[in-house]
Swiss-Prot record:
This is Aquaporin Z. HAMAP family: Aquaporin_Z. The record marks F44, H174, T183, R189 as: Selectivity filter. The chain crosses the membrane at residues 10-30, 35-55, 90-110, 131-151, 160-180, 202-222. It comes from the Bacteria. It comes from Rhodopseudomonas palustris (strain ATCC BAA-98 / CGA009). It catalyses: H2O(in) = H2O(out).
Length: 240
């Protein structure tokens, strides 16, 4: 069994969670020079771009259970690899959240009650959006994310541009949905911070598994019907 791809997924998801959530926890509201919503959106997108070039040839650079499941639904990824990929991704996200907590808690005034980049709905949505609105947003955003991934890694797509297209798509997704759910589209990314916040974050975590996984499957299936891959099974950005 080749464990390199699982280790690559763990490291890649660690980077996405640490860089993305870290930008929100540490840098977003920093006095005078805080990066704000746009900066956080860019951090998440850039984390995917950089990892796609770093580990795309090893694991396909999924970094996200919804991407793994969506690619499988789209005929681009072997079903037997779904579970180990997701386990590796979740472990990477938890490790990132642990390191982020270690660093962030070293600042005076640090308070987990501020959310620690967790995702939420209702009273815990940044814009106080209700459960239905948050669920729909996560499904649609993840569906479109998979649509871009499937398209940019298709055998007929221009070679070499998939990481940029995927990263920019994630930036756009965050720009739209941070006010609604604080943007998940990634169950692993949601799980890491939620475990440290506890309470409401864990109680609401179900939505940030169910909605992204559903959206991922929808995106994969729809693109598979729209434009079947002529070259067989690939593993994400690996083939491009």
């Amino acid at each position: 069994m080749n464990t390199n791809k699982y280790l690559a997924e763990m490291i890649g998801t660690f980077w996405l969670t640490f860089a993305g959530c870290g930008s929100a926890v540490i840098a977003a509201g920093f006095p005078q020079v805080g990066i704000g919503l746009v900066g956080v959106s860019l951090a998440f997108g850039l984390s995917v771009v950089t990892m796609a070039y770093a580990i795309g040839h090893i694991s396909g650079c999924h970094l996200n259970p919804a991407v793994t499941l969506g690619l499988a639904a789209g005929g681009r990824f072997p079903v037997k690899q779904i579970a180990p990929y997701i386990i590796a991704q979740v472990l990477g996200a938890i490790a990132a959240a642990a390191l982020l907590y270690l660093i962030a808690s070293g600042a005076a005034g640090f308070d987990l009650a501020k959310g620690f980049a967790s995702n939420g709905y209702g009273a815990h949505s940044p814009g106080q959006y209700n459960l239905v609105a948050c669920f729909v947003m996560e499904v649609v955003m993840t569906m479109m994310f998979l649509f871009v991934i499937m398209g940019s890694t298709h055998g007929k797509a221009p070679a070499g541009f998939a990481p940029l297209a995927i990263g920019l798509a994630l930036v756009m997704i965050h720009l739209v949905s941070i006010p609604v759910t604080n943007t998940s589209v990634n169950p692993a990314r949601s799980t890491g911070p939620a475990l440290f916040v506890g309470g409401w974050a864990i109680g609401q975590l179900w939505l940030f598994w169910v909605a992204p996984l559903l959206g991922g499957v929808l995106g994969g299936v729809i693109y598979r019907v729209l434009s079947p891959e002529p070259t067989g099974v690939v593993e994400g950005v690996k083939a491009r």
